[in-house]
UniProtKB/Swiss-Prot annotation:
Species in which this protein is naturally found: Mus musculus
Domain of life: Eukaryota
Protein name, entry field: Cytosolic Fe-S cluster assembly factor NUBP1
The protein's required cofactors: [4Fe-4S] cluster
Main location, first listed in the record: cytoplasm
Tissue specificity as recorded in UniProt: Expressed in trachea epithelial cells, and kidney inner medullary collecting duct cells.
Further remark: NIH3T3 cells expressing reduced levels of Nubp1 show an increase in number of centrosomes per cell and an increase in the fraction of multinucleated cells.
PANTHER family reported in the protein's UniProt record: CYTOSOLIC FE-S CLUSTER ASSEMBLY FACTOR NUBP1, NUCLEOTIDE-BINDING PROTEIN NBP35 YEAST -RELATED
A Gene Ontology BP annotation from the UniProt entry: protein localization to cell cortex
Binding residues for ATP: G62, K63, G64, G65, V66, G67, K68, S69
Keyword Acetylation (UniProt): yes
CDD domains, A to Z: Mrp_NBP35
Length: 320
C-alpha cells in the first residue's frame, strides 16, 4: 500500500476507505474492500503472554474524578493482603497516570530484562506498571494521538514480565476511548473476567455510567458490578450519615436495579482516603476501622468470589 494520508482511520477501522480523509487516497478502494486489513499479530502474542495470568479485571468509570484509580489501587492492596496471592496493577490512563503517586512509587523507573519490562514492586506480591514510570517528571504532559496510545498499551500487555499472577487489575481512563477499545481488543483472546464500574451517586455521573454499560454490552465485556463511591459521609464522632452528593435519581442502587446489574457496594467518603493516596500508602493500614475500609473489604470479597466462580465455570466448560 502507498503512503497513508494524514488522518487515516487505519485499514482495520470500520471507516477504512469511507472516511473524509480517505477521499483521493490511492489506497481507498483497497481499504474499502477490506483487503487491506490483516489480523494484528500482537493479539496472539498477548494471548500467549497472558497465559500466566489467572484473572483479568478492568476498572472503568464514565466520568473522571469519581475515584477509579483510588479504587484500582486499593483493590490491588486488598487482594495482595493474602501473601500467597500475586497481584499486578496496570495503569493505562496514558494522559493522566496517577497510580505511581497513589502507590508511593513516584520517581521509579522501568527496567528492561531479558524477558521484557520488569514491573515496579510495592511488595513481593504486588507489581505495578504505568506510563508514569517512563516520564522524566510527574509534571510532564503526555500529548499523544490514538495510534501512539494504542501502541503503548500493546507494549504494556505484550512486553511486561509479570510472571505468574493471580489478578491483573487494569486501571483505565474515564469514558470510552481508544484505550478501552485497545485493551478489550488485545485481551479478548486472553479472556477478560469482567469490568468493575465506578460512579458517584449524582445523576450527572450516572448518565455517563449508562454509556459505559452500553459500551460493555457492545464489546461483549462482562460486567462484574458497579461500585458507588463517595456514597455519603459518616461522622466519626456521632456516626450519623450525611449525603454530600445527593442521589437525586436514586443513585447507583436504582440504576443497577433498572439495568439488572449487580451493585457491589457503596463506599462512604473518608478524608483519610485522600491523605493516604497523597502519601502513597494503603488506606486500609491508615484507617483499619473506618466504615469505608469495611465497605472496600466487602466489595473486594465479592469480586474475589465472582472470579472464583468464573474460573470454576470456565474449567467446567473445558473439562473432558
Amino acid at each position: 500500500m502507498e503512503e497513508a494520508p494524514h488522518g487515516c482511520p487505519g485499514a482495520d477501522s470500520a471507516q477504512a476507505g469511507r472516511g473524509a480523509s480517505c477521499q483521493g487516497c490511492p489506497n481507498q478502494r483497497l481499504c474499502a474492500s477490506g483487503a487491506g486489513a490483516a489480523p494484528d499479530p500482537a493479539v496472539e502474542e498477548i494471548r500467549e503472554k497472558m497465559k500466566t495470568v489467572r484473572h483479568k479485571l478492568l476498572v472503568l468509570s464514565g466520568k473522571g474524578g469519581v475515584g477509579k484509580s483510588t479504587f484500582s489501587a486499593h483493590l490491588a492492596h486488598g487482594l495482595a493482603e493474602d501473601g500467597d496471592t500475586q497481584v499486578a496493577l496496570l495503569d493505562i490512563d496514558i494522559c493522566g497516570p496517577s497510580i505511581p503517586k497513589i502507590m508511593g512509587l513516584e520517581g521509579e523507573q522501568v527496567h528492561q530484562s531479558g524477558s521484557g519490562w520488569s514491573p515496579v514492586y510495592v511488595d513481593d506480591n504486588l507489581g505495578v506498571m504505568s506510563v508514569g514510570f517512563l516520564l522524566s517528571s510527574p509534571d510532564d504532559a503526555v500529548i499523544w494521538r490514538g495510534p501512539k496510545k494504542n501502541g503503548m498499551i500493546k507494549q504494556f500487555l505484550r512486553d511486561v514480565d509479570w510472571g505468574d499472577v493471580d489478578y491483573l487489575i487494569v486501571d483505565t481512563p474515564p469514558g470510552t476511548s481508544d484505550e478501552h477499545l485497545s485493551v478489550v481488543q488485545y485481551l479478548a483472546a486472553a479472556h477478560i473476567d469482567g469490568a468493575v464500574i465506578l460512579t458517584t451517586p449524582q445523576e450527572v455521573a450516572l448518565q455517563d455510567v449508562r454509556k459505559e454499560i452500553s459500551f460493555c454490552h457492545k464489546v461483549k465485556l462482562p460486567i462484574i458490578g458497579v461500585v458507588e463511591n463517595m456514597s455519603g459521609f459518616i461522622c466519626p464522632k456521632c456516626k450519623k450519615e450525611s449525603q454530600i452528593f445527593p442521589p437525586t435519581t436514586g443513585g447507583a442502587e436504582a440504576m443497577c436495579q433498572d439495568l439488572r446489574i449487580p451493585l457491589l457496594g457503596k463506599v462512604p467518603l473518608d478524608p483519610h482516603i485522600g491523605k493516604s493516596c497523597d502519601k502513597g500508602q494503603s488506606f486500609f493500614v491508615e484507617a483499619p476501622d473506618s466504615p469505608a475500609t469495611a465497605a472496600y473489604r466487602s466489595i473486594i470479597q465479592r469480586i474475589r468470589d465472582f472470579c472464583n466462580s468464573h474460573q470454576s465455570h470456565a474449567e467446567t466448560l473445558i473439562s473432558p
